[in-house]
């Protein structure tokens, strides 16, 4: 475990209390637009060491008697079979996955709303499927002039034509499988219909980043810009908050740009707006739970560097854009980030130069730097993994964890019978052979038991490593970056 910069227990307590206050402020009913990742928020855990990836869902569990989940999905995304790139499943399948997860955690899922519904065949099929599964579902329609034509939006022909979502709890959490799903529009539609029914209700927004009460150019906020460099999101000073209160806070450009329109919609629906600024709309308390600013600054700078290497790698792979790299270079300059902040970078490059072959290096949680080189039987990633396990287990480097009598037949199998060009073992293959060796070799067993100790290590490689290796390191909690070049000049890479 590395240094802690964030008090997670304090966050769970203060964040849930803040949401309760906002519910009370609006007379007992709040629509909370939940942005970002509800589960597995690894970005937050990387830049705020001590933040647990499941903190947000655990916080909601503390409020579970009050919580009702509404999941929004854009009907157009169903029609287009839009995919979640990180999971490899369509948005509609992800809705079902989310429902299962929420239910497993004891949270009540009230309904699913199909936004921008326009009679799409695939959307109708999904509605039918939901109904057969016993899930309540509603339809919201495209509104001409949204979001700027306030008079039309706040009318029976605008929000008024949407289905009213029946709810039974005081905290309605509106979430979605991805961006552009209509979460905010769903909340506004509900406010309109509740007001017509004489029901007091309010709206708030839950976004972890940017952290409103940290400086604009704080590395934690710059790391958010790095994470969204492929989008048009830019952190900025909230001018409305500054004008209303004389206090400098940070928000991102889309919320600042849409605020005058939202304000007008609130006024049209409820007679007056409850908010004077986009910052007012938020309920995020993460900034109040930072207990070591320097730890969070250092972690955020490392995150920015990783994002930069990822963008450069994706550019080589044909998946990225030059503009993204340029934005990240600017963020690096603002945060004072260079490759030298990660000792693994220089160590990997030095090892590669010394051996004339791909190499890697890893900074262990205790600060030790371990290297790994390419051999006849092991790729650089597999060699680095074994060397790191040896170091954690204090196993002398001269001892073999896996004998050549085991490694060489596996390499032969790959090239002779499985048509692999590369005989060297990847990390998943070397872990399987390590597990087998552990049955008869006590040192291999000792090394295998060190796997949990790899979490929060930083690794860098002199070339782009395989997807298989990346997946294994990710599962082990090792953060990886690569130089933006392939081992070979071949055009097709796996």
Each predicted region: which residue ranges?
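Short clusters of small/polar residues that mark proteolytic maturation junctions
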Residues: 373-374
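Hydrophobic positions on the alpha1 helix immediately C-terminal to the Walker A/P-loop
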Residues: 186
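Flexible phosphate-sensing "switch/lid" loops adjacent to ATP/NTP-binding sites
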Residues: 1-175, 190-351, 357, 364-366, ...
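The conserved Walker
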Residues: 178-179
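A short, polar/charged loop-to-alpha-helix boundary motif
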Residues: 377-393
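Short HxH-centered metal-ligating active-site micro-motif
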Residues: 391-423
């Amino acid at each position: 475990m590395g240094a802690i910069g964030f008090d997670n227990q304090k966050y769970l307590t203060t964040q849930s209390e803040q949401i309760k206050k906002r519910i009370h402020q609006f007379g007992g009913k709040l629509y909370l637009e939940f942005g970002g990742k509800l589960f597995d928020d690894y970005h937050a855990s990387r830049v705020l060491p001590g933040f647990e990836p499941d903190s947000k869902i655990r916080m909601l569990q503390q409020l579970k008697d009050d919580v009702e989940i509404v999941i929004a999905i854009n009907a157009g995304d169903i029609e287009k079979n839009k995919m979640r790139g990180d999971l490899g499943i369509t948005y509609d399948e992800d809705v079902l996955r989310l429902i299962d997860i929420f239910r497993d955690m004891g949270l009540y899922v009230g309904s699913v709303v199909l936004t921008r519904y326009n009679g799409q065949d695939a959307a109708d099929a999904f509605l039918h499927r939901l109904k057969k599964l016993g899930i309540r579902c509603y339809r919201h329609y495209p509104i001409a002039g949204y979001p700027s034509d306030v008079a039309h939006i706040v009318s029976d022909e605008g929000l008024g034509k949407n289905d009213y979502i029946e709810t039974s709890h005081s905290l309605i959490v509106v979430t979605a499988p991805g961006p552009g799903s209509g979460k905010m529009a769903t909340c506004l539609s509900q406010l309109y219909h509740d007001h017509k029914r004489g029901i007091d209700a309010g709206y708030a927004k839950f976004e972890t980043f940017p952290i409103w009460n940290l400086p604009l150019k704080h590395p934690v906020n710059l790391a958010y810009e790095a994470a969204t460099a492929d989008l048009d999101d830019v952190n900025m000073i909230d001018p409305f908050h500054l004008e209303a209160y004389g206090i400098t806070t940070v928000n991102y450009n889309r919320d600042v740009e849409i605020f005058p329109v939202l304000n007008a919609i609130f006024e049209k629906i409820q007679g007056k707006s409850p908010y004077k600024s986009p910052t007012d709309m938020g309920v995020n308390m993460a900034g109040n739970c930072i207990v070591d600013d320097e730890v969070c600054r250092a972690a955020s700078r490392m995150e920015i560097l990783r994002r930069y290497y990822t963008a450069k790698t994706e550019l080589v792979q044909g998946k990225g854009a030059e503009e993204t790299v340029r934005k990240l270079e600017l963020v690096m300059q603002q945060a004072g980030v260079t490759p030298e902040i990660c000792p693994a970078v220089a160590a990997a490059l030095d090892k590669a130069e010394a051996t004339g072959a791909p190499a890697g290096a890893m900074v262990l949680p205790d600060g030790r730097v371990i290297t790994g080189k390419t051999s006849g039987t092991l790729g650089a990633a597999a060699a680095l993994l074994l060397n790191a396990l040896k170091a954690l287990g204090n196993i002398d480097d001269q001892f073999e964890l896996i004998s050549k009598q085991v490694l060489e037949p596996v390499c032969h199998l790959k090239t002779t019978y499985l048509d692999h060009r590369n005989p060297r073992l990847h990390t998943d293959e070397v872990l399987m052979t390590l597990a087998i060796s552990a049955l008869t070799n006590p040192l291999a067993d000792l090394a295998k038991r060190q796997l949990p100790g790899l979490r929060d290590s930083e690794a860098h490689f002199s070339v782009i490593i395989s997807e298989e290796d990346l997946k294994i390191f990710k599962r082990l909690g090792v953060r990886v970056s690569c130089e933006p070049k392939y081992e070979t000049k071949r055009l097709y890479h796996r």
